[in-house]
Amino acid sequence: MYQGRPTAPGGEVLKSDWFRYWRWADGDEKVIELRAEGFAHDVPADAGLVFQTIDLAASLKSSADYTVIQTWMRIRADKAHHFLLFDSVRRRMDGPELIAAVEAGVAKWKPRIVGVESSGFQLAICQMLKKKGIPVREVRPDRDKLSRALAATPAMEAGRVWFPASAPWRHDLEAELLGFPASAHDDQVDCLSMAIGGFVHLPSTFTPAPVNISTSPAHQRAQKFLDIARPFDYGGQPSTIRESDGGVYLEEED
């Protein structure tokens, strides 16, 4: 049962058997421990690509959707990409509070890329965030929510998606995932789908557009130039991040 709605035991689309958990291997929070049956890997906390996915909703009404800001790190282990969820902010916010929350998240986590689902009012917010030097990539879904969630299931079923074991919000997140698509809200599902099933996928015609953000204090750890894609649809060909002297690029995989 999630928010008064019955849910299938173990999940309808996203299964509880697929959930994996990462932990800090030391008190200094410098090494991440990944442990599952047949899999053991230790990862330096700064070893991966940090990015964010955001699902915007600008309303304080009790019936409104939530704004969700998720922070992820993508690493490569055993010749496969793994996605580690670091943080998830989920609350109802109006416009000014929403902008401030995104700025705070960027300042704290210093993501290379911030994916924002953009349509309607979100387009204006994306432009405001870009003007503040935030490395926004607009994401325009070309499929329904269920299809996008299904695109994320292979990585989850393969044990390549990891949640923080000790996060206070973890149980609410899992309840929403297991309740999908019957749950009253699916904002966290949308962000997860974007991160795993769409955010690192680009059309074959993708061309990076360089944006200089070197003067932004929130991005002191970023490259001098960060190449930010034009708006793109979920789908396309799998891509990887390549770093060069000129910035960060997403390239198609063979």
Predicted regions and their residues:
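Short, function-defining helix-loop hinge/capping sites that tune catalysis or transport
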Residues: 49, 63, 69, 125, ...
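Mg2+-dependent endonuclease catalytic cores in nucleic-acid-processing enzymes, primarily RNase H-like
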Residues: 5-9, 13, 17, 68-70, ...
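Short glycine/threonine-rich catalytic loop with a Thr-x-Gly-x-Asp
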Residues: 184-185
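Acidic two-metal-ion nuclease catalytic site recognized across multiple nuclease folds
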Residues: 11-14, 196-254
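An active-site-proximal beta-strand-loop segment
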Residues: 54-67
